[in-house]
Amino acid sequence: MNHSETITIECTINGMPFQLHAVPGTPLSELLREQGLLSVKQGCCVGECGACTVLVDGTAIDSCLYLAAWAEGKEIRTLEGEAKGGKLSHVQQAYAKSGAVQCGFCTPGLIMATTAMLAKPREKPLTITEIRRGLAGNLCRCTGYQMIVNTVLDCEKTK
């Protein structure tokens, strides 16, 4: 296949319809960054760090491993889509208030993973073990994770 050939991808990103063009094999993270969605970080590019976490149909995924072509017909949410009317989401507010993260590189991925975790219906509150498991794909070099876990617990109480 000639690399100059492109595919057309129709999807919704942060509530807005998009018709995008990409070379087959392009990761979703790259395509999103080309649209100016710079919260989608390119860290490890092998699905180990979680800096590229976005929601696809409500599920947190590593967008560096997710082909752009697979986004056809999907609803994609990035950190840029979480604030509504200039107001941060309750998860964004909680992370900002708690100071759970330091340098900020991991913050978008953690917020998106937290958002997905909190959106899942359940009968009981999340346990610390469930939170740690839910954030296991998101690396943070600056913290010991306890403040992040506490932030998720606070988010659940205030949602």
UniProtKB/Swiss-Prot annotation:
The lineage of its organism: Bacteria, Pseudomonadati, Pseudomonadota, Gammaproteobacteria, Enterobacterales. Binds 2 [2Fe-2S] clusters. Keywords: 2Fe-2S, Iron, Iron-sulfur, Metal-binding, Purine metabolism, Purine salvage. Pathway: Purine metabolism; hypoxanthine degradation; urate from hypoxanthine: step 1/2. The keyword Iron applies. Residues 7-82 form the 2Fe-2S ferredoxin-type domain. [2Fe-2S] cluster binds at C44, C49, C52. Its cofactor is [2Fe-2S] cluster. The keyword ATP-binding does not apply. This is Xanthine dehydrogenase iron-sulfur-binding subunit. The gene is xdhC. Iron-sulfur subunit of the xanthine dehydrogenase complex. It comes from Escherichia coli O157:H7.
